[in-house]
Amino acid sequence: MASHEVDNAELGSASAHGTPGSEAGPEELNTSVYQPIDGSPDYQKAKLQVLGAIQILNAAMILALGVFLGSLQYPYHFQKHFFFFTFYTGYPIWGAVFFCSSGTLSVVAGIKPTRTWIQNSFGMNIASATIALVGTAFLSLNIAVNIQSLRSCHSSSESPDLCNYMGSISNGMVSLLLILTLLELCVTISTIAMWCNANCCNSREEISSPPNSV
């Protein structure tokens, strides 16, 4: 009889204190919408770092092409209409700065997924996507102007062969810049979509799994 009372007392104390791991602590229930990477697999962090590295390489190539186009301005100053885009917009410079900044922040946010780095990376990628759209418009306009200038090379007072040569080089370089800009736009949109998808999933988990009431 005494043994039964001891067993009942042990069961009562076990139920009062709860079994280990049966109740989640406040740290487990407190999930932040601003930290979508913490609870995700490692491949998402690696994906974010890869996208950031692509942005950095893309920015370096855009800057290099812009410098090359600018260097052609001086020896062939009479063909400046092929390179007006480089000097009047300056897109290869400030575009490369934005793209390199967003890529660097994405890499850092993948390594250290804190709230501050994630917010900075998200905002910078939105800015880079906007810059890429503006750059696409500038480059498309430059290609259209170059095509019209190439058609007038035959009636030019200078050397028609040199005019065609410079126009072809400018068109090729600007077309390559346009391809890199479109690639940057796709990368930034993919990064933004990944953040939004992770935040939406975390928000649904918080709504569907509220803390247990005492």
Curated annotation (Swiss-Prot):
Disulfide bonds: none
Chief location: membrane
Keyword annotations of the record: Cytoplasm, Membrane, Receptor, Transmembrane, Transmembrane helix
Pfam families linked: CD20
Positions in the Cytoplasmic compartment: 1-49, 103-124, 197-214
InterPro entries in alphabetical order: CD20-like (IPR007237), MS4A (IPR030417)
PANTHER family given in the database record: MEMBRANE-SPANNING 4-DOMAINS SUBFAMILY A MEMBER 3, MEMBRANE-SPANNING 4-DOMAINS SUBFAMILY A MS4A -RELATED
Oligomeric and partner information: Interacts with CDKN3. Interacts with CDKN3-CDK2 complexes through its binding to CDKN3; this interaction facilitates dissociation of cyclin A from CDKN3-CDK2 complexes.
The protein's name in its UniProt record: Membrane-spanning 4-domains subfamily A member 3
Organism encoding this protein: Homo sapiens
Gene: MS4A3
